[in-house]
Regions:
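A short, Lys/Arg-enriched interface patch at domain edges and termini
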Residues: 194-210, 264-270
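Polyanion-binding surface elements
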Residues: 214-236
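Broad phosphate/nucleotide-binding scaffolds in NTP-utilizing and phosphate-metabolizing enzymes
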Residues: 2-121
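Short, solvent-exposed cationic patches
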Residues: 33-47, 51, 164-185
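DNA-contacting interfaces and partner/effector-binding or oligomerization modules
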Residues: 115-168
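Short helix-start
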Residues: 245, 249-270
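Residues in the recognition helix of alpha-helical DNA-binding motifs
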Residues: 242
């Protein structure tokens, strides 16, 4: 993950208005805003979130912010522009870096920083991100969070907040496809229908995990070496490298074949 501070030359506090997290392996973005922003000071795209005291911007909206600040892929002379900058293909992040994140819409710009440079209060927001998730019954999802809590989310109660949930409940394969969204900021169905962490925490009921739920978890979220290689699109040799580097940990050592938590494997695809 790469981290960028977002500045606004017009903001009175003269410190970053937020931070852009770029997950380069999957080309996804998450923006964390400064809580001192009000809806009038926040970029227009984010004002409705700030008004609701939501300062973690979803990946789709974060991507829209990025796309609004770079040359569009459909521009007539995009080929020559990429060639001039020695780019083999269209890359939003590289174009954003080239422009410094500046555009005619406002006075915002970005500056590369280390994650450790992000204020602790903002970094701590990710401490309760989703670690694992799995389905239970016909319409529930069990989520394990970084703050060591487990919550049961009844999807039928979220249809009003997110109409796309209805299509999830009507298709068992889509329902079973649930996985942790990039960075743990959401859960995702079929890689396209997401429920943000704040909504999961708000509506989910804290539970003591039952044996039935654990059996479901084991069946859905523990994968062998072959499946791990399939998820990451890599060879067994590459998988061994990740294990040696401590980026992937087998559930139990000294087995004839390694087993992994699916969420731990998927983190290496972000």
């Amino acid at each position: 993950m790469k981290t960028y501070a977002i500045y606004d030359e017009e903001w009175k506090m003269k410190c970053p208005i937020g931070y852009l997290y770029y997950y380069d392996k999957c080309n996804e973005f998450i923006i964390e805003l400064n809580r001192e922003l009000d809806k009038w000071e926040a970029p227009l795209l984010f004002s409705s979130y700030v008004e609701k005291s939501i300062y973690t911007i979803p990946k789709e909206v974060s991507m829209l912010w990025v796309k609004g600040r770079v040359i569009p892929s459909g521009r007539q002379n995009i080929g020559s522009i990429l060639k001039n900058h020695k780019m083999k293909s269209y890359d939003e992040m590289k174009l954003l870096e080239l422009s410094g994140g500046r555009c005619s819409q406002d006075n915002c710009y970005i500056k590369k920083v280390e994650f450790e440079d992000v204020p602790l209060a903002i970094r701590k927001r990710s401490e309760d991100n989703v670690l694992e998730c799995f389905t239970s019954g016909e319409s529930d999802v069990i989520c394990l969070f970084g703050d060591d809590t487990v919550r049961r989310i009844d999807l039928t109660k979220l249809v009003e907040a997110n109409g796309k949930i209805a299509s999830v409940l009507m298709n068992k394969d889509v329902y079973k496809s649930v996985k942790v969204g990039v960075g743990g900021y959401s859960i995702a169905f079929n890689d396209c229908i997401e429920i943000e962490k704040w909504l999961l925490l708000k509506t989910g009921k804290k539970i003591n995990v039952s044996a039935k739920d654990l059996y479901s978890f084991v069946g859905d979220n523990i994968v062998d070496t072959a499946k791990a290689c399939e998820i990451l699109g890599c060879s067994k040799q590459n998988l061994t490298y990740l294990i040696d580097k401590g980026r992937l940990k087998p559930i139990k050592p000294n087995l004839k074949e390694n087993l992994f938590f699916r969420g731990d494997v998927e983190k290496n695809s972000w």
